[in-house]
């Protein structure tokens, strides 16, 4: 913001000092302050604040066009912000290890690399030795119970196999934060159940903070510790709903009273915001 003094030589601008960064409450992993993003001159996010807790899965859900994917892309540094600040446990993004699972797995993998080399790619970028890479790859293969041939190229695999490999690659460097942008949107039901199970296993073993964008409310609630419900643009937080059913969650979870209540309340808030 600037103030203008109309003097004979034209306007004089004085920069207003940026307000001090206000940290989140204890247990916060990602702190967002004053986040602002414009598209075609219109605000998508304007002076947006959010605290994302550590060691939790937070699902992001909201109306079409509210900027769900844009939000996690800005947090992950894939989309520039116009103003604001984002810190990870008090650190900048460059000092934070992250993983990202893209919605379009067909474009996420390097087609000229074998699948096994795609998965190992972030480990090699870190400069890990061959022995370290081999050890971590063996852990991932065992964890995901991989049955398909990792020496094949991505385009030779099924959609579910490609997305499994994408998730393995995102988890390979053992990230502090894992971003998941509609990771189930192109998967069949059987593969969706498998990936849900594996993500929960990873979370229970590591406590990795996860941000999940989903267009499926049932899926968003099912995996979440918190459901972040967004408004229409300019986007605000409509409500953050806690959901605390024990893990691992299974198909039986879908009929539990607490799940049904949380899903119903989420739907009520969503419908209110869509009609706003």
Language-model region placement:
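Conserved structural motif at the start of ABC-family nucleotide-binding domains
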Residues: 30, 44-47
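The feature captures the beta-strand-to-loop junction immediately N-terminal to the Walker
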Residues: 61-63
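Helix-to-loop junction immediately C-terminal to a conserved catalytic motif
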Residues: 76
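Conserved ABC transporter NBD signature motif
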Residues: 83-96
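Conserved ABC ATPase "signature" region
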Residues: 131-149, 201
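Conserved ABC ATPase signature
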Residues: 153-157, 161
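A short, proline-enriched helix->beta-strand linker immediately N-terminal to the Walker B motif
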Residues: 172-176
């Amino acid at each position: 913001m600037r103030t203008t003094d109309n003097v004979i030589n034209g306007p004089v601008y004085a920069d207003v000092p940026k307000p001090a960064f206000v940290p989140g409450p204890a247990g916060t992993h990602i702190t967002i302050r004053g986040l602002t993003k414009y598209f075609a001159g219109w605000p998508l996010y304007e002076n947006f604040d959010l605290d994302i807790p550590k060691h939790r899965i937070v699902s992001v859900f909201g109306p079409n066009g509210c900027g769900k994917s844009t939000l996690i892309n800005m947090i992950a540094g894939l989309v520039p912000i116009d103003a604001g600040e984002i810190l990870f446990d008090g650190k900048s993004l460059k000092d934070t290890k992250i993983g990202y699972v893209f919605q379009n797995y067909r474009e996420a993998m390097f087609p000229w690399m074998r699948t096994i080399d795609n998965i190992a790619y972030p480990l090699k970028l870190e400069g890990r030795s061959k022995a370290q890479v081999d050890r971590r790859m063996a852990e991932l293969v065992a964890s995901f119970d991989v049955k398909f041939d990792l020496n094949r190229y991505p385009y030779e695999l099924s959609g579910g196999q490609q997305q499994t490999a994408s998730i393995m690659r995102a988890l390979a460097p053992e990230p502090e934060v894992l971003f998941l942008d509609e990771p189930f949107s192109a998967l069949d039901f059987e593969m969706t159940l498998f990936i849900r199970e594996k993500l929960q296993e990873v979370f229970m073993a590591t406590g990795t903070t996860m941000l999940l964008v989903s267009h499926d409310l049932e899926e968003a609630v099912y995996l979440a510790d918190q459901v972040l419900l967004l408004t229409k643009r300019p986007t605000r937080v409509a409500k953050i709903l806690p959901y605390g059913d024990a893990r691992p969650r299974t198909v039986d979870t879908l009929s539990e009273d607490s799940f049904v209540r949380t899903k119903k309340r989420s739907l009520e808030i969503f419908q209110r915001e869509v009609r706003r």
